[in-house]
Design a protein with these regions (language model features):
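Double-stranded beta-helix
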Residues: 6-13, 93-126
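Glycine- and acidic-residue-biased ligand/ion/polar-headgroup-sensing regions
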Residues: 48-66
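Short acidic-glycine-tyrosine-enriched beta hairpin
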Residues: 66-87
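A short glycine-rich, His/Asp/Glu-containing loop-to-beta-strand
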Residues: 7-50
Length: 126
């Protein structure tokens, strides 16, 4: 998919809030995740996708697998940023309504769900 100059951002409703995809090319994706207070995304990992996040507003807990394989929990606030490498287990949980900017490789369907509050199961293909 190539960039479409002047195209509107695409809003995708999610059970935890919504995503606003503002860039989608064959090399990268840019989106804003709006996570409602008290909601969290799936505990997941990606087979191919590599992502970096920036907290634009709000406060969240980041669950992120470290180099030893242990999932650690860290509170992030506005201005904080992190890299989520390919294959690492992770989850975002909003303490308050949070706007998270995510820039990643373009594999939007590359999700291996390990746990989900909304009953979504399984693995999507990258």
């Amino acid at each position: 998919m190539s960039a479409d100059r002047g195209a509107s951002a695409r809003r995708v409703e999610k059970p935890w809030g919504h995503e606003l995809i503002w860039a989608h090319t064959d090399r990268y994706v840019g989106k804003i995740l709006v996570i409602e207070a008290g909601k969290r995304l799936s505990l997941q990992r990606h087979v191919v996708k590599d992502e970096s996040i920036y907290v634009a507003a709000g406060r969240l807990r980041l669950y992120l697998e470290d180099d030893s394989g242990e999932v650690r929990v860290e509170e992030l606030v506005e201005g904080d940023h992190r890299h989520v490498p390919t294959g690492r287990i992770h989850r975002y949980e909003a303490i308050e309504r949070t706007e998270l900017i995510e820039v990643s490789t373009p594999e939007l369907d590359d999700v291996v769900r390990l746990d989900d509050d909304f009953g979504r199961e399984g693995t999507s293909a990258p």
